[in-house]
């Protein structure tokens, strides 16, 4: 199915309004066809016969026709805008919904700004094309068909002469249409590049200022801006060439009409009024053809944008639920990794033959040098990625056999990079459990040592924290994230450097809260600072994607291996 047909499918739910809009459009277009026919009667009947009554009748009729035309124009404009906007809303929501359920791998391979451009620039390009082009197409086609019908009624030979130019127009539109689609695609790509640079620089403004790289970033933006300018001008060049070519072909046709029509009037085969009306219709015929060429160009722009939009909707996610996936019921937290291997691509093995048995309620610390696979191993547990070999079990249930939602509901995560949303402190904590009460939210904040600093703020829990929590300190952001995880009350916890952003006093209080939270829950803790995991039930030491040591703190020190070396290095 081509992209144009796919776009039409989005309009199907609104087909009733669409048909009504087309009806009003056709009636409004008929009003344009009325004037030349009346002009014929004015010349051939009113002026020739000096018929005052007919003149008055025509005058009143013109007013009535244009009054009706105005009502129809309003109705068709409103209805087409409604349908167009609804179609755009549906497409934008479909793209956003698809993005929400794509795997992490999709986002890691693309710039954030490029992904944003799909929802903003590309869907926005469809918006103008769908609303304007659909309305204009029906209007111009109505005028085109109506004009041809009336022209054949006036003089069929002249009408056939008019149609000779049609194949030339169609060929020109086809040739230029292909160029427009190509240049429009490049134009959308350049717009996406600008969005990507803009998103990256705004989100990294503190780094830019700290390195005094404002001029460097301006130069980057100017480069992309001019690349976009060149793409826009290339597209404009093609559009600017198309219209004069169509006009030239139409002008040649009209010239033949005047020449041949004049002979017919001189020979008495056609009245002067009929020739004037015919020429007006022929001119009207040229205008729709010219406008249709412009509409065709806009449609090609829309198809270039649609191609990018549908590329998102057609994207296959790496993480797929089985058709018969079941709900993961309440768990106690036993976790088993059995011969698990993972790699991002064929040549890059990240985890190799991981075997790990964790009892319910145990605290498992994961340590090792950078790049050892510590974060990757815990990312497999909520199925952010799937292993290429082996299986992972929770309470002896293969996590690949259960629904993603029921699996992830059982797991709480405090990531290394704190992510908060623009809104209030209360809403950010509530994100952990949207059904929680105010008392439960406050209890979670107290457990994370966040309640006191929240109450010191002017708006307390309703304090707006800004984008990504920019109005809070690093330690405050971390504690809000921990409170959010506490509120979720999961059976399995993943703590990735969970207290690394806190000051000494807050770290102690939060660590105490986490220690209490982890009681009775299975916890995976990634920590570079070994002082935070000395009491772990099990410490696994990773190197180059493999578990090289495993045991308690005391057991690993006795081995005098990698862990012992890391411990001595930190506590020297």
Q: What is each PLM-predicted segment?
A:
Residues 1-32, 39, 47-59, 68, ...:
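Membrane-integrated ABC transporters
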Residues 2, 11, 43, 80-81, ...:
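Juxtamembrane loop-to-helix connectors within ABC transporter transmembrane domains
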Residues 13, 104-105, 123-130, 134, ...:
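An intracellular "coupling" helix at the cytosolic face of ABC transporter transmembrane type-1 domains
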Residues 13, 17-30, 61, 65, ...:
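Transmembrane helices of ABC transporter permease
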Residues 26-37, 66-74, 126-129, 133-145, ...:
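Hydrophobic alpha-helical transmembrane bundles that constitute the permease/transmembrane domains
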Residues 49, 85, 93-125, 196-220, ...:
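Short intracellular "coupling" helices and adjacent cytoplasmic loop segments at the cytosolic face
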Residues 50-53, 150-167, 234, 238-307, ...:
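Helix-loop-helix
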Residues 321-322, 328-572:
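ABC-type nucleotide-binding domain
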């Amino acid at each position: 199915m081509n992209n144009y047909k796919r776009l039409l499918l989005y309009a199907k739910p609104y087909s009733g309004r669409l048909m009504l809009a087309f009806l009003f459009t056709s009636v409004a277009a008929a009003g344009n066809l009325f004037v030349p026919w009346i002009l014929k009667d004015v010349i051939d009947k009113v002026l020739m016969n000096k018929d005052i009554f007919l003149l008055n009748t025509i005058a009143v009729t013109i007013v009535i026709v244009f009054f009706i035309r105005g009502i129809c124009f309003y109705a068709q404009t409103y209805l087409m805008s409604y349908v167009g906007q609804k179609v755009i809303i549906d497409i934008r929501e479909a793209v956003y919904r698809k993005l929400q359920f794509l795997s992490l791998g999709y986002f890691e391979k693309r710039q954030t700004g490029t992904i944003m451009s799909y929802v903003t620039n590309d869907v926005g390009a469809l918006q103008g094309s769908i609303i304007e082009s659909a309305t204009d197409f029906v209007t111009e086609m109505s005028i085109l068909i109506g004009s041809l019908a009336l022209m054949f009624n006036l003089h069929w030979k002249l009408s056939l002469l008019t149609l000779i130019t049609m194949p030339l127009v169609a060929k020109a539109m086809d040739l230029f249409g292909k160029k427009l689609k190509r240049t429009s695609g490049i134009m959308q790509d350049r717009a996406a590049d600008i969005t990507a640079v803009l998103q990256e620089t705004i989100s990294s403004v503190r780094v830019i200022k700290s390195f005094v790289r404002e001029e460097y970033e301006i130069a980057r933006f100017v480069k992309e801006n001019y690349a976009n300018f060149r793409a826009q001008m290339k597209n404009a060049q093609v559009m600017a060439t198309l219209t004069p070519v169509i006009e030239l072909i139409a002008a040649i046709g009209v010239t033949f009409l005047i020449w041949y029509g004049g002979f017919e009037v001189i020979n008495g085969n056609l009245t002067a009024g009929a020739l004037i009306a015919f020429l007006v219709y022929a001119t009207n015929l040229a205008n729709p053809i010219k406008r249709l060429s412009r509409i065709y160009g806009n449609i090609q722009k829309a198809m270039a944008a649609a191609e990018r939009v549908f590329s998102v909707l057609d994207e296959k996610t790496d993480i797929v639920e089985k058709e018969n996936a079941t709900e993961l019921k309440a768990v106690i937290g036993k976790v088993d990794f059995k011969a698990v291997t993972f790699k991002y691509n064929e040549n890059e093995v990240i985890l190799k033959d991981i075997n790990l048995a964790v009892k319910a309620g145990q605290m498992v610390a994961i340590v090792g040098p950078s790049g050892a696979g510590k974060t990757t191993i815990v990312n497999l547990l909520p199925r952010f990625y799937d292993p290429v070999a082996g299986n992972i079990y929770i309470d002896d249930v293969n996590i690949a056999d259960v629904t993603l939602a029921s699996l992830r509901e059982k797991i709480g995560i405090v990531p290394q990079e704190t992510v908060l949303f623009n809104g209030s402190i209360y809403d950010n904590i509530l994100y952990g459990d949207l059904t929680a009460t105010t008392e439960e939210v406050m209890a979670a904040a107290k457990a994370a040592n966040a309640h006191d600093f929240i109450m010191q703020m002017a708006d307390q829990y309703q304090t707006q924290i800004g984008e990504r929590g920019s109005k809070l300190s690093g330690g405050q952001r971390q504690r809000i994230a921990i409170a959010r995880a506490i509120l979720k009350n999961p059976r399995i916890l993943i703590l990735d450097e969970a207290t690394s952003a806190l000051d000494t006093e807050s770290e102690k209080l939060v660590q105490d809260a986490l220690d209490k939270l982890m009681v009775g829950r299975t916890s995976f803790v990634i920590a570079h600072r070994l002082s935070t995991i000395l009491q772990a039930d099990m410490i696994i030491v990773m190197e180059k994607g493999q578990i090289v040591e495993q045991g308690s703190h005391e057991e690993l020190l006795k081995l005098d291996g990698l862990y012992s070396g890391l411990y001595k290095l930190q506590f020297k």
